[in-house]
Curated annotation (Swiss-Prot):
It comes from the Eukaryota. One of its GO terms (biological process) is zinc ion transmembrane transport. Residues 185-222 are annotated as: Disordered. It is a multi-pass membrane protein. Zinc transporter that may be involved in zinc uptake from the rhizosphere. The gene is ZIP7. Induction: By iron deficiency in roots. This is Zinc transporter 7. The chain crosses the membrane at residues 47-67, 80-100, 120-140, 228-248, 262-282, 292-312, 324-344, 364-384. GO terms for molecular function: zinc ion transmembrane transporter activity. Keywords: Cell membrane, Ion transport, Membrane, Signal, Transmembrane, Transmembrane helix, Transport, Zinc, Zinc transport.
């Protein structure tokens, strides 16, 4: 027991030492905008950012949902496939170029002690762990929804079989009246039960068939709709987690020079992330209310983060050791989730899953769109 207490004290001491403030006067000056601090102008720009990012998110996530019945925006159209590939490139670049870089910047800050934060590559390790955790979550969620789908299929089959059995039983109870003539030429009714022989096909078309829910695959096959449900929910989780961080970072800034380029960059980023998420929601065929809730939750997350950041900007110290550690770890987690989702559930699923095996032209367009999306989002790192 004594050793355990000593171990806890030692761990607490190491944690306190790891969060001790380092020498970071230059970092604080840089965060303040190097002479570009203006609280009033920054607050106005935050209002503009909230409105612009909200509109971009609503339009981005709403286009695939509103266009489900329009030929040009259906989920199997060439335009939709190319746009979704572009959005996948944007999300991939967000994870690698933006979130992972921000995590490295936060956890290597001189405001943090060199040990342990600069003695081990925490950003890459945490991102890898988050990607593996997302894989496990993806697997478990797919198994859960697959089980629900299979149970629903069995329920429909059982109901159809019961209806067919009831129909056959009612037919067996029907008696048919026939008329025979006796030797005295007198006609007499004869009641004969009308029964079906179950050893050969039924001759009457009752219209009862064993129905299956739409989108069910073969035995052991995961239906595409089940995968789309899982992908859309995990993708939203990853997007929302880093949207909160981005919103808070912008909200606590007091420098118009820092905020101004972020408005355009985040609007672009929000639009195409929304388009990818909206496409996944459309493919999952959620009910209208569920789709609307998911879309609204995505659209308001970044503006809400900006508002929260603006509210605490007067006393929040973004360069405090605790703030840097939390920001760095959350950025790393978000990077891992986004990298996994973009590579596995968006790019590999569409490019290697057989959806684009028909048209060479469509394949070329999708690859060009993917590379352009990644390049465009990467180039925004110059300003934001």
């Amino acid at each position: 027991m004594e050793r355990f207490v000593q171990f806890l004290r030692r761990g607490n001491g190491l944690m306190a030492a790891s969060l001790a403030a380092g020498s970071c006067a230059e970092e604080v000056a840089k965060a303040e905008g190097a002479g570009c601090r203006d609280d009033a102008a920054a607050l106005r720009l935050k209002g503009v950012a909230m409105a612009t990012i909200l509109v971009a998110g609503v339009v981005g996530v709403g286009l695939p949902l509103a266009g489900r019945k329009r030929r040009a925006l259906r989920t199997d159209s060439a335009a939709f496939v190319a746009a979704k590939a572009f959005a996948a490139g944007v999300i991939l670049a967000t994870g690698f170029v933006h979130m992972l870089h921000d995590a490295e910047h936060a956890l290597s800050s001189p405001c943090l002690p060199a040990h342990p934060w600069r003695s081990f590559p925490f950003p890459g390790f945490v991102a890898m762990s988050a990607a593996l955790a997302t894989l496990v979550l993806d697997f478990l969620a797919t198994r859960f929804y697959e089980g629900k789908h299979r149970a629903e299929t069995e329920r429909v089959k059982a109901a159809a079989a019961a209806a067919l059995a009831a129909s056959s039983a009612s037919d067996d109870d029907i008696t048919v009246v026939t008329v025979t003539e006796d030797d005295n030429d007198n006609k007499a009714p004869l009641l004969q039960p009308h029964s079906h022989s179950h050893s050969h096909p039924h001759g009457h078309g009752h219209g009862h068939e064993l129905a299956q829910p739409e989108g069910s695959g073969g035995e052991g096959e995961v239906p595409a709709q089940v995968r789309s449900v899982v992908v859309s929910q995990i993708l939203e989780m990853g997007i929302v987690s880093h949207s909160v961080i981005i919103g808070l970072s912008l909200g606590v800034s007091r420098s118009p020079c820092t905020i101004r380029p972020l408005v355009a960059a985040l609007s672009f980023h929000q639009f195409f992330e929304g388009f990818a998420l909206g496409g996944c929601i459309a493919q999952a065929q959620f009910k209208t209310l569920s789709a609307a809730i998911m879309a609204c939750f995505f659209a308001i997350t970044t503006p809400a983060g900006i508002a929260a950041g603006a509210g605490v900007a007067s006393f929040y110290n973004a360069n405090s050791p605790r703030a840097l550690v939390v920001e760095g770890i959350l950025d790393s987690v978000s990077a891992g989730i986004l990298i996994y989702m973009s590579l596995v559930d968006l790019i590999a699923a569409d490019f290697l899953g057989g959806k684009m095996t028909g048209s060479t032209r469509q394949q070329v367009m999708a690859y060009i769109a993917l590379f352009l999306g990644a390049l465009s989002m990467s180039s925004l790192a110059i300003w934001a």
